[in-house]
């Protein structure tokens, strides 16, 4: 019956590997307390100039899920003083029905919901802010190198899969058009990346004031190496700069 089906849905373990409270570390809402829901699984396999994906446990080697819808509800009730949620990954749009359900649950607890996505697939949700982090060519994995988290050699298959999903401009456009607000938040390794950002803006029709350029890095020293020239570039070109508050504060740690 319907009651049994609903109970089974509430008890089902979902592909969510982390739920915790934190300050938003990036973008226009940086510094605001959030409830973070991390979805496991991603279509991309990012490897940047000096670092791999900062959440390899949700991408290169995705962990199994640990939480249910009831766990999400209970977390909201326990932390009712926080009214912002970010659903991140991994790639949340990989699990469309669950993403929609998480947004519906969040809205019942009066949450302002940010969906952080690489933009590989369009999903219509009740989210408020699409935080779009399109991956530039600086993220393409390099076959033959070692992925530290897994200890395995990066393969040509990893590269092909990454490139297949990296630039889904149609999905990105639909995500922007079908949600109340958005921000474009690309990872920048070098000044040469700016040309790709400008091309992406041209394709998507995104003005500079909606773009937040973010320095690449998993550790403080890596951010420090890029912060000065990237802030100067933002001033010169008219972009927003976003730091990475969680890395500045804690380094490469989980659950922060």
Where are these regions (language model features)?
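A detector for short, charged/polar N-terminal pre-domain segments
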Residues: 23-25
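Conserved AdoMet/S-adenosylmethionine-binding subsite of the radical SAM
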Residues: 93-256
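S-adenosyl-L-methionine
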Residues: 28
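Short, Lys/Arg-enriched N-terminal segments with co-localized hydrophobic residues
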Residues: 1-8
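Conserved Radical SAM active-site core
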Residues: 8-21, 33, 44, 48-130
């Amino acid at each position: 019956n319907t009651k049994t089906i609903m109970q089974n849905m509430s008890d089902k373990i979902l592909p969510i590997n982390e739920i915790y409270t934190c300050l938003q570390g990036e973008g226009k809402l940086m510094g605001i307390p959030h409830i973070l829901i991390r979805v496991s699984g991603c279509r991309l396999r990012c490897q940047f100039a000096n670092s791999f994906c900062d959440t390899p446990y949700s991408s290169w080697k995705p962990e199994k899920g640990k939480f249910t819808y009831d766990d999400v509800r209970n977390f909201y009730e326990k932390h009712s003083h926080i009214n912002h949620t970010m659903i991140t990954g991994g790639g949340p749009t990989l699990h469309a029905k669950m993403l929609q359900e998480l947004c519906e649950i969040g809205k019942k607890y009066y949450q302002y919901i940010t969906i952080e996505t690489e933009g590989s697939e369009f999903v219509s949700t009740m989210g408020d802010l699409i935080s779009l982090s399109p991956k530039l060519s600086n993220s393409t994995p390099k076959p033959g190198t070692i992925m530290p988290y897994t200890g395995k050699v990066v393969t040509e298959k990893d590269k092909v899969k990454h490139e297949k999903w990296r630039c889904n401009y149609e999905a990105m456009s639909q995500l922007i058009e079908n949600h109340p607000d958005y921000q474009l938040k690309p990872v920048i390794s070098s000044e040469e990346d700016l040309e790709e950002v400008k091309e992406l803006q041209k394709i998507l029709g995104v003005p500079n004031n909606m773009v937040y350029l973010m320095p690449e890095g998993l550790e403080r020293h890596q951010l420090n190496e890029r912060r000065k020239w990237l802030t100067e570039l933002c001033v010169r070109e008219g972009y927003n700069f976003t730091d990475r508050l969680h890395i500045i504060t804690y380094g490469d740690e989980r659950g922060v």
